Each structure stands twice: as structure tokens, then as C-alpha cells.
Amino acid sequence: MKHNISVTGIKLYAYHGCLDEEALIGGHYIVDVSLETDFTQAAKEDALEKTIDYVDVNAIVAQEMAIRSKLIEHVGQRIWDRIINEIDGLKHLSITIKKLRPPINGNVDEVSITIEGEVN
């Protein structure tokens, strides 16, 4: 049996980007995190301590998004590193960061990066 916990649509305002204006003005971001785990015992026992607490996942995302970076790729890697080091029981992890209305030439709704893979 495969179990997934998803924390999707985490809306944040942050100051990432290579342009000076982005450091001053900031922009809107949406982060999605999907975690594969085994929550059989948590489901049987109704026990939060036997599964991944999505409050912790949300906190990690918010803390890392608050640290300015030029690249959302860098932010995504920091989120990945913290989740795999701080949350037990992971089998697979996927993180997507969407930068809404990026300041690039053209009419673009969003740009995004995804980091996904197995966790040992």
C-alpha cells in the first residue's frame, strides 16, 4: 500500500530573484510538497506522532522561503535538505515552487521548479 501526505498551495510572499527590484518589492509564490510515507499505524491508532505532521512541513517551507535567494532552485534545495534531515519515515519527496507573474519579458503566469526523488 502506498501512502502520501500532500501540503499544497502554501501561499507566501518572498524576495527571491536576481533583479534588485525583486529584493525590494518581492513577489508571490506557491509551494507544493508531497511526501510518501507509511502511515498505517497512525491510521489504525489515530496517533499523530506515528505520521508526518504537516504543520512541521509548512513551518520548514515558510522558514526557508523567508531567506532571500537569487534562485528558487536554491530555495527548493534548502527545503529538500531540511525535510529529509528533520522528518522521519520518508520514502519519496516532491517539492514544487511556483513564482507567480515573474518579471520577465512576456506575459507569463508563473515559472516553477520541481525537485523529486526517493529518500533513503
Pin down the residues of each PLM region:
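N-terminal, polar/charged subdomain of small-to-medium soluble alpha/beta proteins
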Residues: 1-120
